[in-house]
Amino acid sequence: MTKTLPKDFIFGGATAAYQAEGATHTDGKGPVAWDKYLEDNYWYTAEPASDFYNRYPVDLKLSEEFGVNGIRISIAWSRIFPTGKGEVNPKGVEYYHNLFAECHKRHVEPFVTLHHFDTPEALHSDGDFLNRENIEHFVNYAEFCFKEFSEVNYWTTFNEIGPIGDGQYLVGKFPPGIQYDLAKVFQSHHNMMVSHARAVKLFKDSGYSGEIGVVHALPTKYPFDANNPDDVRAAELEDIIHNKFILDATYLGKYSDKTMEGVNHILEVNGGELDLREEDFAALDAAKDLNDFLGINYYMSDWMQAFDGETEIIHNGKGEKGSSKYQIKGVGRRKAPVDVPKTDWDWIIFPQGLYDQIMRVKADYPNYKKIYITENGLGYKDEFVDNTVYDGGRIDYVKKHLEVISDAISDGANVKGYFMWSLMDVFSWSNGYEKRYGLFYVDFETQERYPKKSAYWYKKVAETQVIE
C-alpha cells in the first residue's frame, strides 16, 4: 500500500556552516579548532567546502525549484563573535541577515542552529564545554542571536550533543582528539545540556517569537541476542551513552535512577567522576517542558553484544567496508546481524530503527510535543555521469525512512517534517569530500550544482506527499 505524509509536512534539506560555507577566514570570521585540526590530521580542509557563503542564492533557488520548503542552517559562532565573546563582527551579522532574507524570498523556511560542532578556537582550546565558563559564553551568544535575528521562526540550540562528546573524547576523531575518556563524554553532554536549558529558558522568559528546540542524534541500540540478558544490558548501557542521558536531561530535567546506575557502572569500570551541581538540575528542570520540538538525526542502528575486554575503537573514515571496530570496556561491542545492509563506512541501514526511536520518545517522554527528522540520508561515493548522479540507492534509502515516518504518524507520533542530509554535497567532518549526501551534486573544482536523480524524486514526493 502506498504511504502518504500530511499536507503541512516540511520537506527540507540540511546544511551546516562549517561543512558548507567555506570562507573560513573571510570578513572577520574567527578561527575554530577544526581549522588547524584538519590541517594537522586529515587529507582535506573546509576550504572551499560548497562555497555556500557566496553561493547560497543558487542553492536556495534550486531548493525552491525542487520543492524543498525548509532548510537547516547553522550560524557560525565565530562569524558573530570571532573569539566566542566580546566584540561582535558586523560583517558576520550582515551575512546571516542576507541569508535569511534570501530563504524567505524563496519560500524556504530556515531552521537555524546556534552550534553545529564549531566552538570558536579561543573557547575550544580553553576546555570547550568541559569548562563551565563556556555555558555563560554560549548563553550570551544565544541571547545576541535571538535579539538580532528576529526574522528566524525556528531555533535549535545545539546539533548533536551526543556525537560532540563522542567525537571529542571517545572516538577521538574531533578536536582535541582524546580517546576513551567516558567521564569527559558524560561531562560534555551534561554541560551542553545545561547550556541548552539556560538558552531555552531565556528565550521563553524574554518573550521572543518563534519556536525553540534541540537536535539530538539518536542511533537505535539493539541487543545482538535479545534472549541473552548480557547482550540486553550491553544495549542498555550503549543507549545511555548515546541517547538516554541526553534525552533524560532534555525532557525529565534530571537523570533517572536507571540512567545514573548505568553511568556510575561505566565510570566505575573506566575511571573518572562527574561534576553535577544542584544549580544544573534547577536549570534542566526549568526548561524540560519548554522545548517546542525535538529534532532527531537518524542514520543507523547498532547491535550490541556483551564483551569482556579493553576498549578499542577504529573509525572507518575512508569508506573501506568492514574496517571499523567498536568495543567499550564494561559496556559491550558492536556486532551486526549478517543480513543487515551496511554502507561503505560501515553504517548500518535499518529504517525500522527510526520508527522504534520515534515511538520510544513518544512513550518515554510524553512532553516531547513534536518531532522533526532533522537529518537522514545516505553517504555514497557518487558517480557523476551525464551531468547527474543515478543514485537509486539513495532514493531507496530515503523512501524507506519516509515510509516508517508515515507509519509512526499513523501510530500517533507527532512528526512534522523531514530534512534530508544534505541539501547539496558538503564536506564530511571525518571523511572529507569523497562521502557525498546531497540532493544536488557539487563539482568542488568549479562549484557548479547539478540535481541528482534523487532531487527529481524528492520534488515529486514533496509536491504530492505520496511516497512512491
From Swiss-Prot:
One GO BP on record is: lactose catabolic process via tagatose-6-phosphate
What top-level class of enzyme does the UniProt entry assign?
Answer: hydrolase
Keywords of this entry = Glycosidase, Hydrolase
Biological pathway: Carbohydrate metabolism; lactose degradation; D-galactose 6-phosphate and beta-D-glucose from lactose 6-phosphate: step 1/1
Listed EC numbers: 3.2.1.85
**PROSITE patterns per UniProt:** GLYCOSYL_HYDROL_F1_1, GLYCOSYL_HYDROL_F1_2
The entry lists its GO molecular-function terms as: 6-phospho-beta-galactosidase activity; beta-glucosidase activity
Is Hydrolase included in the keywords of this UniProt record?
A: yes
Name under which the protein is recorded: 6-phospho-beta-galactosidase
In its UniProt entry, the species of origin is given as: Streptococcus pyogenes serotype M1
Q: Recite the lineage of the species.
A: Bacteria, Bacillati, Bacillota, Bacilli, Lactobacillales
Question: By which gene is this protein encoded?
Answer: lacG
